[in-house]
């Protein structure tokens, strides 16, 4: 199926230490970027959350403390991730209530200006199925 895009869109998913966007941390972010010319770019960043990953969270996504202990923290990747999604619409499952708020919190903690996210358009596929 060919999408008729007016601007690039990034489908993204986070794996995290929990479900609280204000306090929990990202341990992995995966992004599929679709350009208007159908070009696709996939990126995955494994991230050290700098705190223990609860067993409950690891049982869901399979990422353990051992797997991230030697990975850089979010701040290390923050500019690269921001540049990758800058100017794109964003899409995913539950992005409006969880993924995007948590991502914005991580950017704020990394001193990234998040004012551009005020204007970002999102497609939250969770709303399609509710």
Where is each model-derived feature located?
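Conserved non-catalytic scaffold segment of RNase H-like nuclease domains
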Residues: 1-119
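Short alpha-helix plus adjacent loop in nuclease-associated cores
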Residues: 120-130
